[in-house]
């Protein structure tokens, strides 16, 4: 079984700043979110066998809190989208070209200097193919970031037509997918009724 989680909250998240490759630590709220996610897994009887994490500290720490005794592997393909010159931009007052992109991810290309969404999907897809057999036999947790996670969900749902790009994925939201007959199932949000 495959579980994909977005890292817990950071100060940049709280300040509504565009956070891509900036290596920000979890804040107290983010640590609490990761602890809550660990409790959710425990309450559902899910034991994580292995963790794959983005190299950024917020994703690594989220994974450590959720699965402290599981094998952990860092994979650079799980890093967040490269926002280039827009890194750190205030999302309450984005540049016009970024606003156009955010309003229509499917038809408007990423602004110059920003990683194209097709590249995010390609690297996440490459990673998912590499662990497919392992995910059929073990409970695998992927600790990553919002846009990288959306790239994985887009890859796993070929007929989504870009619907995940506009979907809000909150800190420590979890999606799950199985491997059946050698293929990934469509991912579903792991929702135990908690308030969002």
Feature locations, PLM:
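Short beta-strand scaffold positions
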Residues: 53-54, 122, 143-144
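Phosphate-handling substructures
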Residues: 66-125, 166
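Acidic, His/Gly-rich catalytic cores of divalent-metal-dependent hydrolytic chemistry
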Residues: 187-196
């Amino acid at each position: 079984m495959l579980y994909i989680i977005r890292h817990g909250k950071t100060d940049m998240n709280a300040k509504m700043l565009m956070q891509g490759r900036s290596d920000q630590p979890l804040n107290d709220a983010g640590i609490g979110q990761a602890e809550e996610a660990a409790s959710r897994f425990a309450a559902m009887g899910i034991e994580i066998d292995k963790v794959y994490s983005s190299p950024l500290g917020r994703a690594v720490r989220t994974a450590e809190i959720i699965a402290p005794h599981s094998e952990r592997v860092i994979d650079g393909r799980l890093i967040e989208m490269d926002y280039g010159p827009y890194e750190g931009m205030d999302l309450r007052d984005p540049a016009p070209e970024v606003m156009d992109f955010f309003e229509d991810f499917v038809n408007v290309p990423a602004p110059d200097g920003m990683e194209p969404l097709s590249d995010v999907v390609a690297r996440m897809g490459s990673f998912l193919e590499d662990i497919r057999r392992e995910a059929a036999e073990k409970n695998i947790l992927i600790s990553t970031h919002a846009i990288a996670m959306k790239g994985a969900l887009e890859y796993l749902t070929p007929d989504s037509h870009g619907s995940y790009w506009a979907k809000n994925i909150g800190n420590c939201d979890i999606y799950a997918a199985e491997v059946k007959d050698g293929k990934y199932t469509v991912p579903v949000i792991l929702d135990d009724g908690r308030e969002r």
